Amino acid sequence: MRLTDLEIAACLEEGSIVIDPRPDAEAISGVSVDVKLGNQFRVFQDHTAPYIDLSGPSSEVQEALDRVMSDKIVIPEGEAFFLHPGELALAVTHESLTLPADIVGWLDGRSSLARLGLMVHVTAHRIDPGWQGKIVLEFFNSGKLPLALKPMMTIGALNFERLSSPVARPYNKRKSAKYRDQQEAVASRISQDK
């Protein structure tokens, strides 16, 4: 069952869900908690590779990703990151999230931003039980105009579901957890798939 605003507030108070910095009461509404945009981004650089062979050897996949992904881009306070039509960028939430083994989280984009063509997460919106770290956002501008994204703007909302029992292998305990404790806009680690 999805947690209500009262249940979310209680989980934050007791520490079973940790959001740091802790959101104001106004950020919790209905069944969600608003999250803000952090100041770190990554983009695909200009490149000459015609494609990335995701089924190729791990080392070749990683080399290709290293060639096309930018270094971390940090946007100073008060300035904006411009996402142009047809572009994909990675960003990160301002907040860090910690979930227990019996709660799964979901990230939803804002309807007001979607109506401008902004996808906040391309596909990955589930946050596994046991997650710890910031949430990487996969932005895509499907609109017709560039969008100015400023750190600390409300970018999405988290909602939570309590599971019938704790999971046997929470994310932060899995050896295969590629994004454990992420604190910045981490590029794809698909080359680490087994």
Swiss-Prot record:
Q: Which residues form a coiled coil?
A: none
Task: Name the InterPro entries for this protein.
Answer: dCTP_deaminase, dUTPase-like_sf, dUTPase_trimeric
Q: Name a GO molecular-function annotation.
A: dCTP deaminase activity
Binding annotation for dCTP: 110-115, 128, 136-138, 171, 178, 182
Listed GO biological process terms: dUMP biosynthetic process; dUTP biosynthetic process; nucleobase-containing small molecule interconversion
Q: Name the active site residues.
A: 138 (proton donor/acceptor)
Tell me the Gene3D superfamilies matching this sequence.
2.70.40.10
Top-level EC class as recorded in UniProt:
hydrolase
Segments for region (Disordered):
172-194
Name one matching Pfam family: DCD
**Keywords for this entry?**
Hydrolase, Nucleotide metabolism, Nucleotide-binding
The reaction(s) annotated as catalysed by this protein in its Swiss-Prot or TrEMBL entry are: dCTP + H2O + H(+) = dUTP + NH4(+)
| Pathway(s) this gene product operates in, as recorded in its UniProt entry | Pyrimidine metabolism; dUMP biosynthesis; dUMP from dCTP (dUTP route): step 1/2
Query: So what EC number does this one have?
Result: 3.5.4.13
Q: Which family does it belong to?
A: Belongs to the dCTP deaminase family.
Cross-referenced NCBIfam families: dCTP_deam (TIGR02274)
Say what the protein does: Catalyzes the deamination of dCTP to dUTP.
What is annotated about its quaternary structure and interactions? Answer: Homotrimer.
The name on file for this protein is: dCTP deaminase
Source organism (scientific name): Shewanella loihica (strain ATCC BAA-1088 / PV-4)
